[in-house]
């Protein structure tokens, strides 16, 4: 998300250590940062903390640089770690941290937040994979309403699963979510195929911010032959969106990495009623005339498993960021810890210009790396 002042950004951390059953003491947070872009003209290529509300520089990632999600008013409709004496409500486990209980802080065992957007009222919406749920908070991260559920879609981790079968695979929930320019509609993109839907198709659903309900409008996104998942959905206009599509391969294993950004338009459907896709950027083939990463090549590649953020900076510039899948390794080099990399990519064709998209050389304008870290 855009940050508090120009040149800053608001970033969301993943749910913790990669699974619901090992992340009960990981707090769900958003951080405000400022990249110092490494460009052909200079720059350190580092990312630093800023004040979450004012954008003022901070000496470290401290309490002023973040917000922590919480549910002090007990809006969510299911038991949280804060409701238990011991983690996972198991007496054999350690006691739940007192700060989690007293503040009813949300953890990586309560939600797997994968997407976040700010609405017209300044409230935040989080797309979760455990339900999957949409969760509304105020600007401080306090939950304001009961979680919203997509009818007929339930994951194996859902607290509402009961005796019925799951209709969505694990970790296949609201990976992508966009907000329209007016801030009154959200668009969720599932990462996995719902049971009974055609293979390799994903649902995009419209959500009304004012009524806090899904509208019933739905579109079908088809994965490419080489694609296995999506990473993000970002709005260009009321009908046009960017989608990150990828597979699980990296530079060190799993086959040939497939990492691309496509444009879709909800008014443009093929003969099967599925969204027409236009390739915008091949993230494995980005022009790098200044060799910003110093690898000796004039082509920059972005081979990480999960590339999960794309933000439109201006008509010709995209910000793209990967999730380092802490404690993942091997994205670029075997056995080497994966950083989170920030790319500033120049497009030859302006983003808002409808009907003129053509795959043209995308150029790397800036590069930043955030070292692997957890907590703060």
What label would you give each PLM region?
Residues 1-350:
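Sequence/structural signature of beta-propeller domains
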Residues 360, 364-368:
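Residues within alpha-helical transmembrane segments of multi-pass membrane proteins, especially transporters
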Residues 367-376:
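C-terminal membrane-anchoring or membrane-association module
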Residues 348-361:
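Short, threonine-centered small-residue motifs that mark membrane-proximal processing/anchoring sites
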Residues 128, 359, 375:
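Single conserved hydrophobic/aromatic residue that forms the stacking wall/gate
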């Amino acid at each position: 998300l855009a940050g508090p002042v120009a040149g800053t950004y608001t970033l969301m951390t993943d749910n913790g250590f990669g699974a619901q059953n090992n992340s009960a003491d990981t707090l769900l947070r958003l951080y405000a940062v400022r990249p110092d872009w490494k460009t052909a003209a200079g720059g350190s290529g580092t990312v630093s903390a800023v004040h979450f509300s004012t954008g003022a520089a901070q000496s470290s990632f401290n309490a002023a640089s973040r917000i922590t999600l919480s549910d002090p008013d007990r809006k969510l409709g299911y038991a949280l770690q804060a409701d238990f004496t011991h983690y996972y409500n198991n007496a054999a486990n350690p006691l739940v941290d007192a700060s989690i209980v007293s503040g009813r802080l949300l953890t990586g065992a309560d939600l797997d937040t994968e997407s976040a957007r700010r609405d017209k009222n300044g409230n935040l919406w989080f797309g979760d994979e455990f339900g999957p749920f949409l969760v509304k908070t105020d600007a401080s991260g306090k939950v304001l309403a009961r979680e919203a559920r997509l009818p007929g879609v339930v994951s194996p981790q859902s607290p509402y699963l009961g005796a019925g079968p799951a209709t969505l695979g694990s970790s296949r929930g609201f990976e992508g979510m966009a907000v329209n320019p007016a801030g009154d509609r959200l668009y969720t993109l599932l990462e996995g195929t719902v049971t009974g839907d055609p293979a390799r198709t994903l649902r995009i659903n419209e959500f009304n911010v004012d009524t806090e309900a899904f509208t019933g409008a739905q579109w079908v996104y088809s994965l490419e032959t080489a694609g296995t998942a999506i990473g993000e959905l970002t709005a260009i206009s009321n009908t046009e969106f960017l989608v990150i599509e990828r597979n699980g391969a990296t530079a060190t294993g799993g086959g040939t990495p497939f990492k691309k950004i496509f444009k879709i338009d909800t008014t443009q459907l093929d003969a099967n009623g599925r969204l027409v896709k236009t390739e915008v950027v091949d993230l494995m083939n980005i022009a790098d005339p200044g060799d910003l990463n110093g690898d000796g090549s004039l082509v920059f590649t972005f081979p990480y498993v999960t590339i999960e953020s794309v933000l439109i900076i201006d008509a010709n510039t995209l910000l793209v960021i990967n999730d380092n899948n802490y404690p993942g390794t091997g994205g670029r080099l075997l056995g080497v810890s994966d950083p989170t990399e920030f790319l500033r990519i120049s497009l030859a064709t302006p983003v808002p210009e409808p009907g003129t998209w053509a795959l043209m050389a995308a150029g790397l304008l800036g590069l930043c790396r955030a070292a692997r870290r957890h907590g703060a």
